[in-house]
């Protein structure tokens, strides 16, 4: 038998690093510094101290981060869901596409005219730095959740501009010939990737949902693995068909997010954990592939810091801000949305594409991307809570609820509905016996501040309560009106952000607890 000591040491190191990465989220909450900062800095320092760690090829990083990003986008799509996405679909699409093009163009112009970078490399660099990452924002906020339209826009913009940025970079890398021919090729390639990706995402999401509903499996754990395999299949099919696999899995996640299916909660928890792991892996990969001692060479430090500052203080607030003017947002919400365009895992992936292209100066561009991402996460991310408070962005603190009440049903419980009581709803202050229910409706459970409250006849409903009601499905519209405040202006819901928790907390839509 061969000596397994070295292999055991590798496993031990991986386990310790993983534990440290998870615990860093707790430290991040205390210091108000995004957890990805620790991943970046520690990995970069480790690559300097242990040169063998820096021998990862960019192809390896590209493949690993590609898979990681696919899971991140699918989880993000599930947490948005179709109902929330539909309420802001036009705004999300407009900001995701137009915002990406404007950010890429202005950043490329700044890189060319201010720092003398050639036009082709500048365009690639600008495109790589265009996508945003709301998961970094949510890691800074910790247990505080963004409410209203702002939260939907943050998640939706990132899910939209990630595939757009990737498709645009791929089109730029494939462009050859005269400027006119290259522009035409870029346009055709981009439109084809978007159309094919969206089409396969819709079809694949529907097929996967039917598969989840109609084909029972012998083991509970297999349900989550089936969805994981489905995500990989959708991504692979879209990629083989010359479409955007990232857009395909994001769209599939949106379609599945609001739907009912067996073991849906377990599936959501599994993919939320998988997305968190994927984000950790992506940032560690970026850190390991950059050596801090090499950054001063070629002025990567100074150029990266300058571009990071321009993106944070000029390009996004001013130029992307003009794009948001047609979108109905309060002034504070608009400013917060513009500040929170943080950079994350996608620039890592796009940087590996640039290096893999073999274009002159690609390694320098990758180092610049590292500095910009580090600046964005540390500086912009560090001020997110303060700016949210100053701009009166709606936030609510989510206390941890580690204990769950598991209830299993053999058949789909169509008559069991869950509602979160909105502030100002007609039911607030009303005792259970005085609720204007029909004869066939009963309050089964009442959950308040994470604790079970006896559902007695004299128990009064309070804002924020979770109410489980047994009623005929036809009663659902009336029940929604009873537990939901009448709002003026845009309609919005609140739900946990991607990566924060897999348990959903709808405010205006019923959630069937047996699914």
Where do the protein language model's features map onto the residues?
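Transmembrane helical cores of multi-pass secondary ion antiporters/exchangers
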Residues: 1-401, 409-411, 462
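Short, glycine/charged-rich beta-strand-loop motifs at protein surfaces that mediate ligand recognition
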Residues: 309, 417-422
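Cytosolic Rossmann-like ligand/nucleotide-binding regulatory domains
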Residues: 350, 423-479
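Residues that form generic nucleotide/phosphate-binding pockets
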Residues: 390, 435, 482
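Long, charged amphipathic helices and adjacent flexible linkers at domain junctions
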Residues: 396-419, 489-505
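Short, compositionally biased
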Residues: 459, 479-500, 515
């Amino acid at each position: 038998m061969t000596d397994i000591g070295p292999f055991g040491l590798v496993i031990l190191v991986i386990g310790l690093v993983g534990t440290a990465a998870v615990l860093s989220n707790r430290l991040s909450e205390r210091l108000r510094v995004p957890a990805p900062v620790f991943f970046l800095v520690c990995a970069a320092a480790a690559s300097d101290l242990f040169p063998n760690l820096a021998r990862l090829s960019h192809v390896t990083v590209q493949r690993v981060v590609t898979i990681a990003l696919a899971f991140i986008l699918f989880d993000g799509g599930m947490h948005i869901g179709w109902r929330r996405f539909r309420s802001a679909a036009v705004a999300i699409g407009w900001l995701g596409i137009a915002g990406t093009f404007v950010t890429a163009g202005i950043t490329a112009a700044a890189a060319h005219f201010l720092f003398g970078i050639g036009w082709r490399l500048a365009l690639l660099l600008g495109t790589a730095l265009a996508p945003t990452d709301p998961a970094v924002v949510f890691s800074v906020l910790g247990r505080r959740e963004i409410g209203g339209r702002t939260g939907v826009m943050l998640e939706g913009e990132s899910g939209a501009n990630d595939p757009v940025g990737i498709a645009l970079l791929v089109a730029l890398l494939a462009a050859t010939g005269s400027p006119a021919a290259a522009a035409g090729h870029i346009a055709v390639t981009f439109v084809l990737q978007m159309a094919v990706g969206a089409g396969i995402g819709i079809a694949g999401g529907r097929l996967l949902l039917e598969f989840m509903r109609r084909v029972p499996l012998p083991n509970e754990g297999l349900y989550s693995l089936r969805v994981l395999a489905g995500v990989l299949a959708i991504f692979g099919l879209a990629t083989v068909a010359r479409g955007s696999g990232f857009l395909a899995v994001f769209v599939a996640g949106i379609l599945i997010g609001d739907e009912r299916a067996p073991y849906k909660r377990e599936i959501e928890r599994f993919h939320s954990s998988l997305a968190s792991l994927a984000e950790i892996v992506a940032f560690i990969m970026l850190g390991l592939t950059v050596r801090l001692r090499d950054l001063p060479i070629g002025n990567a430090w100074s150029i990266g810091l300058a571009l990071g500052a321009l993106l944070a203080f000029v390009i996004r607030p001013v130029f992307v801000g003009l794009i948001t003017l047609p979108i109905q947002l309060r002034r504070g919400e608009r400013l917060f949305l513009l500040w929170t365009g943080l950079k994350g895992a996608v620039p890592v992936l796009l940087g590996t594409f640039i290096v893999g292209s073999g274009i002159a100066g690609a390694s320098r561009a990758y180092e610049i991307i590292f500095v910009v991402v580090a600046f964005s996460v540390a500086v912009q991310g560090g001020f997110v809570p303060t700016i949210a408070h100053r701009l009166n962005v709606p936030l609510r603190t989510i206390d941890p609820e580690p204990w769950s009440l598991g209830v299993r049903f053999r058949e789909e419980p169509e008559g069991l509905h869950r509602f979160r009581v909105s502030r100002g709803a007609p039911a607030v202050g009303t005792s259970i016996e005085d609720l204007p229910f029909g004869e066939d409706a009963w309050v089964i459970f009442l959950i308040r501040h994470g604790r079970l409250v006896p559902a007695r006849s004299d128990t009064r409903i309070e804002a924020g309560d979770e109410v489980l009601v047994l009623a005929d499905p036809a009663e659902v519209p009336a029940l929604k009106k009873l537990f939901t405040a009448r709002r003026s202006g845009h309609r919005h819901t609140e739900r946990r952000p991607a990566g924060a928790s897999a348990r959903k907390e709808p405010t205006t839509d019923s959630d069937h607890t047996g699914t």
